């Protein structure tokens, strides 16, 4: 499938389903967001959370800070914006320029290491499109949840798979999920480092429920996940953001029409016991 065939077939999200994004331009929804869904996914996530103005929220893997601004703007919460790859200076300048310097604190650190937060400090933890890279085990959940208040919420929204890989696929991954990135990242094993870790919504629900620390409140696959992927691919192409990603995404979408697993999106919200 080429891009012109995609234009003819791909759909656009129904903006009426996302009142949280009323007034947002398409650029504001997608720009500087990492992973599938962008602020459409963030909007779905906050619907499942119980947050009030003044609550302290950890935005885990905040990327370039758009989700932190979204949380601060829509919910009036105080945000600790943490990312491994984005500098705190960049984030601070961005938050200040957008009018949120006193509401969002940026930090550059590795969330898998010892954390500089007090025990039970956060009212909620929010994580969009990064949790699968490091969070798919009980040990990490125990490490992270020390800093969440009892009764506080952990909300994760992420790229996910419709089905688990079969044993045969784990041995011989589908070509659309096993490829090399363009230089200088050509040595990255995308299957081992990303897709193999994504799993299904049920897998994540079982992990959260089985850790003994969380009660799962909501877990569901987005019914318009396919549409959100389609729209973002067209956005990337129109803005010449990442031609390689456009090409591989087109292949993944077309492959998913006829094979499993296909790419999807989900949210899971749980409460600390």
Where are these regions (language model features)?
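A short acidic, Gly/Pro-enriched loop at the edge of an enzyme's catalytic core
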Residues: 115-125
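A short glycine-rich, Lys/Arg-flanked "PGG" loop and its adjoining helix->strand segment in the class I
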Residues: 138-153
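A short SAM/SAH-binding and catalytic strip from SAM-dependent methyltransferases
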Residues: 124-136
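Conserved class I S-adenosyl-L-methionine
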Residues: 1-49, 66, 155-186
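Short alpha-helix
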Residues: 195-212
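Class I SAM-dependent methyltransferase SAM/SAH-binding core
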Residues: 64-113
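Conserved Class I S-adenosyl-L-methionine
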Residues: 218-273
């Amino acid at each position: 499938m080429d891009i012109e065939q995609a234009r003819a077939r791909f759909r656009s999200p129904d903006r009426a389903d996302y009142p949280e994004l009323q007034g947002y331009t398409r650029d504001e929804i997608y720009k500087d967001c990492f992973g599938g869904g962008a602020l459409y996914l963030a909007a779905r996530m906050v619907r499942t959370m119980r947050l009030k103005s003044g609550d302290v929220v950890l935005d885990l893997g905040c990327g370039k800070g758009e989700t932190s601004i979204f949380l601060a703007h829509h919910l009036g919460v105080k945000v600790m914006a943490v990312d491994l790859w984005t500098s705190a200076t960049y984030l601070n300048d961005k938050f200040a320029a957008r009018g949120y310097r006193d509401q969002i604190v940026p930090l550059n650190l590795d969330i898998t290491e010892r954390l500089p937060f007090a025990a039970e400090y956060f009212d909620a933890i929010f994580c969009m499109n990064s949790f699968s890279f490091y969070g798919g085990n009980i040990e990490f959940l125990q490490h992270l949840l020390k800093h969440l208040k009892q009764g506080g919420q952990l909300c994760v929204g992420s790229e996910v798979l419709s089905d688990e890989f079969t044993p045969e696929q784990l041995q011989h991954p589908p070509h659309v999920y096993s490829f090399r990135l363009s230089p200088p990242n050509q040595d990255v094993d995308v299957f081992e480092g990303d897709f193999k870790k994504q799993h299904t919504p049920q897998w994540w629900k079982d992990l959260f429920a089985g850790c003994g620390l969380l009660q799962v409140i909501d877990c569901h696959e987005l019914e318009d996940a396919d549409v959100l992927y389609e729209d973002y691919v067209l956005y990337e192409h129109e803005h010449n953001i990442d031609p390689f990603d456009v090409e591989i995404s087109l292949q993944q979408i077309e492959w998913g029409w006829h094979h499993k697993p296909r790419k999807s999106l989900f949210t899971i919200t749980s409460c600390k016991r």
